[in-house]
């Protein structure tokens, strides 16, 4: 499912003394089946943009098109349930939203709230519990008896049970250790590929943006500064650092190497293998 934002703007408490501009003239599209990342410093508008993707927030200027549904600023919208069923959002610390007596009931809550029968919802729960790396026996347990990592997977299963066409991830690995983060990100990537999802990742991790995204949207103060491939965006690491952002370790090491040997590699490397190949000729002759 394709998503397109055109001249999108948003103000909190518009036309009041407390009006605050959050987004301004945002123009970006997310192709069907693509994996995109949105990066930017805290307060850049990432999460506000994210909440427009399933109409949790409505634009105050411009429009957003999700599939065949168009949402235009100032136009009253009806039947948003269908849109919200197609766009699943995994927020930071999603486990905080667990509340039911059992894991099964928690996973079934969303689908049943959108009109799925209890029987079909239970079938979905049995399917998605495996998709998040857990087993069926956990369905009868209380979610509050589980480990933190298991609780997060259960919460993610609840989103997947809605059978979304678009998956929006808002810092989905917040609070996890490096191993847990890698497991969760690999899980999302596999789901993205297997289901043909349109995936939008909001992240502070430049490593994840470089590793998984096909396209990166760089934001500052509610506006889009750059849209490009990871290689294009990370080709100017100093500009990212000036914005208060980090860069992937491989990109940082490439910069150190180029300065030390006074050379310029042929491309911005995103993996260790790429960097090793690019460095090899210089290392073989002991530098430039």
Curated annotation (Swiss-Prot):
Keywords: ATP-binding, Cell membrane, Membrane, Nucleotide-binding, Translocase, Transport. It is a peripheral membrane protein. Gene3D superfamilies: P-loop containing nucleotide triphosphate hydrolases. It is found in: Cell membrane. One of its GO terms (molecular function) is ATP binding. Residues 3-246 form the ABC transporter domain. SMART domains: AAA. InterPro entries: AAA+_ATPase, ABC_transporter-like_ATP-bd, ABC_transporter-like_CS, ABC_transpr_CbiO/EcfA_su, ECF_ABC_transporter_ATP-bd, EcfA2, P-loop_NTPase. CDD domains: ABC_cobalt_CbiO_domain1. Its EC number is 7.-.-.-. One of its GO terms (cellular component) is ATP-binding cassette (ABC) transporter complex. It comes from the Bacteria. ATP binds at residues 40-47. ATP-binding (A) component of a common energy-coupling factor (ECF) ABC-transporter complex. Unlike classic ABC transporters this ECF transporter provides the energy necessary to transport a number of different substrates. Belongs to the ABC transporter superfamily. Energy-coupling factor EcfA family. This is Energy-coupling factor transporter ATP-binding protein EcfA2. The lineage of its organism: Bacteria, Bacillati, Bacillota, Bacilli, Bacillales.
